[in-house]
Amino acid sequence: MKIGFLTDVDGYRAPIHPESIEKYSLDIHLEKNIFDYLNYADSSLDNVKTISKLSDLDIVACVENIQDKTIKELKEGAVLIGIFDFDKIEEIKSLRPDLKVLSFFKLPRISRAQNLDALSSQANLLGYASVLRAAKETSDVVPMMTTAAGNIHPMFIWRKIYLII
């Protein structure tokens, strides 16, 4: 069984981490330069092949932004795994009814499946990233500083985020 992993269209996320690949002895195929955003060379992974044809893969994992052209190239009856909202699932099914589409959004939000909960993990990352982005955009000081000369009060992050959005 051949498992393929595709980069996100924006190139900043991948559906698998390099450390996870080395744990399992599976027939894994990666899209070329999938880990560029991590500054991790594909050649440093042992026993991993580059995807030559999408139609050879039995299972394909992506993050969320998969193009129609890519969907059309998939093998008949292949399994497509990703973070798809319900509209995207219907769009994929109308384009290719033979595909089995699995979305992390359809997983139950219970404590046993917490490590698979895409909503919580993505929202958590988004909150963290928005604070960093606000800090980058402002001229204020982020942390509170107490020095011999006095105190520097921290910025109000929520005001800055509101202004950016």
Predicted regions: what is each one?
Residues 155-165:
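Rossmann-like dinucleotide/phosphate-binding beta-alpha-beta segment
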Residues 2, 68-154:
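Glycine/serine-rich phosphate-binding loop and adjoining beta1-alpha1 elements at the start
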Residues 1-96:
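An N-terminal-biased, well-structured beta-alpha scaffold segment characteristic
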